Amino acid sequence: MIPTLLIVGGFLGSGKTTLLAKAAAMLAKRGKRVVVVTNDQAPGLVDTAIIELAGVPAAEVAGACFCCAFDDFAAKTRQLIARHQPDVVLAEPVGSCVDIAATVLRPLAVEAGSTLHVAPFSVVVDPAALREVEAGAIDPATAYIYRLQLREADVLLLNKCDAEPDPALPEAILSAHCPSAALFRISAATGDGVEGWLDAVLAAAPGGGKRIEVDYDTYAAGEAALGWLNATVDLHGGDWESVLPRLMQSIDLRGIAHLKCLLKSGGLVLVANSVTGRPEPHLRRLASVASTLDARVIVNARIACPPDELRQAVEGAIATLGLGGQVKGIRAFSPSRPVPRHRLG
């Protein structure tokens, strides 16, 4: 049987990585072999670390979105398939990426031919971010990207329903915007609804057939409105349970699209994130084995401010911790204009 490629899109902070980790675990319980391809505009991705810590084979496409780095994405997908013979390839594009159907799904279906089944394109939605977009609370060009992501979805996944007081309201908004998309209520954190989604998309006909018009000038402006930062920091001698919330609260910037941090100390692994519409840091344990006096922290920040200002804020927050923070690598930038390798209308 040929492997199935299941690409899961969605805006920054919507819960894509949590969903992929949960889906991989559920598929493994079914006896399926799973691999994951992650994606970011620069190396040093928290998402890749989370997937690898879950014991799932993974490859990272860094430096550009799947559409602009199509050859790298296709090559790494082929390598994972050759090495692990998976039943399912899960892939997560950059959270600000759009036009996936025309620039990734259809070109890949042509290139792979009968050697790969391309599942319906699923897009994850955080109800809080959806409300922010509907209220006009984010940059108009960035909101343009958000709405296009919804329009090109074959399947919409209304996530975080376990924390949503009235999921019927965002569900009605999605149905009005995207009446032709299948809609599932899920919680990537608890797993509610995920099995049903997997059953549906893995048994469905190939996806990626939706055609949308994209103004690439507005698309580029929407991405450039965000400062992006990836950093790796070594710390010593801290109360690790409190470090990530303190660090994130010290990055005192408005306009957070997604701020995600991962801390590893010995066998202790913590991850925390703050997203559009949910500013308070949410901390969870990925592993709870004994920690040591040393820790490594990965910081991924996507915030609506100039890259230099973002870098200064993060470096200042690290210094405020008072834990001898040694920055091992840091890069702050705004994404360059997207130039897809292919575009099949």
Describe each region flagged by the PLM:
Residues 1-8, 13-14, 18, 203-345:
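P-loop NTP-binding site
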Residues 143, 147-157, 161-223:
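Canonical P-loop GTPase G-domain recognition
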Residues 48-55, 169-175, 312-318:
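Short, aromatic/basic amphipathic alpha-helical patches
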Residues 32, 85, 109-113, 126, ...:
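Non-catalytic alpha-helical coupling and interface elements of nucleotide-dependent molecular machines
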Residues 65-68, 189-194, 334-339:
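A short acidic, often aromatic-flanked loop/helix-cap motif at beta-alpha or helix-coil junctions
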Residues 2-9, 14, 18-146:
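Nucleotide-state-sensitive switch-loop elements of NTP-binding domains
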Residues 96-97, 129-131, 163-164, 304-307:
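Short acidic, S/G/P-rich loop/turn micro-motifs used as interaction or catalytic elements
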Residues 36, 183-186, 327-329:
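A structural preference for short, hydrophobic beta-strand core positions in alpha/beta folds
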